[in-house]
Structures are given as structure tokens and as C-alpha cells.
């Protein structure tokens, strides 16, 4: 999330928390090792952090209170209240007494995450995506190493025949090590182990790379499992409300886009509400701004992630696709294309999305066409096929399998679309 650092200048305490500084990512993907280093591409002043989410969330909450927000901790929001089709308030339980309370608001920002109070519970228009129906299993080690060419503090992403591993350096020399695969494959693997601990240990042993990286570390008991099922809502906003972050959509953990999309949608929602209150735009105009920019960010990343899951395509094709997804970037002399590596970095760092929002651009990126007859066009077809299969609810198979069937499709759309 390097793009958000300048937007959070008042959160100096983030630096004080001692999080590992993250300067990029190294992927051992297919037959290649390749790294994206923020400092080499964007300069030495751009970086991000490998945060402990519980601690990081508390930092953000504390800062919100310092800025004047009224914070009620321990409350459970039961539902959002509507007057017709307009969100007007919320109902929650009082944390000390358990009594139900209600409040009315000019605008409601649904940041309820996967609970999705408005899209999933109220409107019931959030649709799951079988293509990215993945499950993650992970644990923590004291001590360990990263691959030699890794950017400082960068995540290592290591491909496997039926999934992929992450190795993340955290503060105090702790490492998060996880494996992600499709739910079907996860359940098949689970049958062969008496416990989740045994399964994780076997997975680490199965990968020579991960095994060597963790050889000097000590496993800390406690395995976590999370369903990383992708989904998207039919609408991201409406009269009186904005659905932000995971409430509106969730992609996949492959390129670590979750925190960026949460911050980005929060930025868009805040700007939209402020512009409405100030009388700069109508509520309808603000909703169009939010819906277009947030959905385009999600769909663009969806296309890139679906393509990267085709592990044998190679970084040159990923970079070329990223260049087409970013399209034209604004410069002092007009518009110019960026090189593929920079475009890829801009996408996974979130800079492309923030640049679009700040420049007021909501034009979809230029997309390759299947009739171009080159590898980039075919890679887009593969990603587009995964999208169509997800939209249709088929197949119940890993995205890599769906991508391998890409020749069955012909696509001439100029933008990704998940609705």
C-alpha cells in the first residue's frame, strides 16, 4: 500500500510500531524468479509495511478517534435501516448491556467486510465466484529467510502445481508461511492428514524452496485456515450508502490487493460524501464516480490476477498485459504509455487506481483483443474466460484449469467486466 502513505501523514505511529518495511515482492513463478522493487521503480521514498493486522487495525481505530470520530467498541451491528431504498441508519447491540440501539445518519458507509450488511444481507445481490474459490492455510515461524534476490522486507510468492505459497517477514523476526489452493484440492489434501498442523507441515516439506527458507526457523503452534472465496456485488453504492472494502467485493490473496482496495474505496467514499455535503456534486454524480472507479479497480485487478494464475505464461506477458490494463498515464506533456514492469508495479501497489481517481479519469483501460493473435491477447482471453466462467458459476475447478481452456473462447471486449 505505498500509494496511501502520503494520504496518512498523521499516522506517524505506524512507523513507531516497528513493522517490517516492505519494498516489494519476489515471485518464483513457473520457471522464473522475478522481483518488483518499489524503490527501484518509484524511488527510495516509496515503501509499505508488512503489518500485523490486529495491531494495525487498532492503530487506525485509535487515530480515527483522535480525528473526532465517535467510536463504540464491542458493538455488533445487526442491520442497516432503510427508508424505501435509502439507507438512513443502523441498529446495533450496546456492548455493556446487550440492549438494541438505533441511530440515524445522513450517509452509511458499510465497512462490515465479508458480513456485507448491505450487499449480502439486505439486498442479497453479492455473488460468489467459483473460479477463485480458494482456501488458505498458514502458520507462524520464529526465524527464517527470504530468497536471495528479494526486495527488502518483500513477500515471497512461490508457485506450486496445484496452488502457491507465501512467505512474509514480520516484525521481531517472525515469518508467516501459508499455502493457497482451490477448495476442491484443499479438501482432497485434508483427507490425508490427521490434523491441520500435520497438513501444514507436509506442505512446507513438499516445497524445497519453502522448506529451505524455514530451515533455520521454529514453528509456533497454531494453524489458521481461511476461505478466500471471491465475490462481487451487483452495486457498490446507492441512495445514502457506500459499500467499502470487502463488503462490496473480494478478489484473491495472490497479489495482496485487499488492504489497497479497502483504503482506496474508503478514500473514494470519503471524497464522494464530502463533495455531496459541500454541494460540489449531486448525490447521483458522486455515486457514479464511486461505482465507476471502485468497480474498474476491482475488475482490472481481477483480470491481472486471473492471468497471473497461468503460471507458465511468463513475466514478459504479465508485464505486457499490465501495460494494456494501465493504458495511458498522464504526464506533463500529454499521455504516454509506461513500461510493463512499471505498469505491473503500479497495479499491485495501487498507484494506477489512485492516479485515476486524483486525475478524475474514469475511462476504462485499453485492453488487448483476442484477434490480435499474440501471446498478450491470448493471456487476456484466458483471464476473460476465467471471468466468464466465474460469472456463470462454472466450473468448480482451480482457475489454472479454467485458464488452460482459453482457446475455447473468443473475446473482443475492451474492458474487463464482472457484472
Locations of regions flagged by a protein language model:
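N-terminal FAD cofactor-binding segment of flavoenzymes
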Residues: 1-30
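FAD/FMN-dependent oxidoreductases across multiple families
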Residues: 17-18, 187, 191-272, 277-301, ...
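A short, glycine/Asx- and small/polar-enriched loop/turn
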Residues: 21-23, 30-31, 81-88, 237-239
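Helix-loop-beta segment of a Rossmann-like dinucleotide-binding subdomain
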Residues: 33-51, 89, 180-186
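Short active-site alpha-helical segment characteristic of glycosyltransferases
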Residues: 56-59
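Predominantly flavin-linked oxidoreductase catalytic cores and closely associated redox partners
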Residues: 62-214
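Mobile, glycine/GP-rich and aromatic-enriched active-site lid/loop segments adjacent to catalytic centers
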Residues: 120, 159-162, 168-233, 237-239, ...
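C-terminal helical "tail/cap" subdomain of flavin- and related membrane-associated enzymes
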Residues: 274-419
